[in-house]
């Protein structure tokens, strides 16, 4: 049964060809390609197309666009016992996501099984049927490890997806649907080991089995593709600047195994940027198109509670003092965002930059322009958090409406 399912999925994904990309993008013969990546996308209103009015034309001019899907897409919802804050949307939102220019979605989210296995499988099915590439999740462990290798004008790009923020039972196993895992292990070590009750240092490490599998997958992808991109749903949400140890380990090991670019998401705020061995790591791309919490109407009805008054929401807001001063659902730095950009030439990444962006009231994200105070705010914020993690923001150079990294 599993073999037939895997073969059907591979056949369906192979039918999504470069010709399908060209049908909705302005592809011309050119000497370089553009890859774009965003953080979390979670849509919760009637007119889904409204979200992308400010970025649609730019995204459709790119050759390949990646996004992180943050919500379950199904009308068959039953809250999982592990769900903290359920996130769902109607499957029709994929029409707007595709129309906006997205080509690849990771579903390696901590919300992937918020509404159980049926809704999870519905989401996978709808993504594939929409003609979008899927990475990071599957109907079982073998399928969850599959990743698309996309032929873009003769350049093959592999996009691998992993999830680290995994409630119990959310990672895929041999006969269990779920996320392709890149779990972390936490150790708490007392600062003064001889005095019980003293504060502790926190260390995190990659799960050894997941790390080995990730390295093997990247090495395998290296033999199939010209460009290998790794996507991780990881980190600590809402905690300014902080990068955990396990994130750095996974990112560095991925690059050592052959990855050309690492992109992170989940934290709902921007995180630092690192250049390691000449390769760029975006530790967190932040929210890209996320509806305000008070508008998660269907999820609140299913839970029978306003999310903002729930215990899980109170626990989340305790992580950051920024929740105390915000005038919106999330801390104000959650609305500073970016689009990661890579230029590919002669089957290599020859340049990486980011485009400052902002998520305003109304959730219609726009790209900032030089002279816009939000442009400067994003640039200064990224410089600050990067320096806070002992990384070098001095390499970032503003060039027109983007910030060059390499």
Feature-to-residue mapping (PLM):
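Acidic, metal/ion-coordinating pockets
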Residues: 2-406
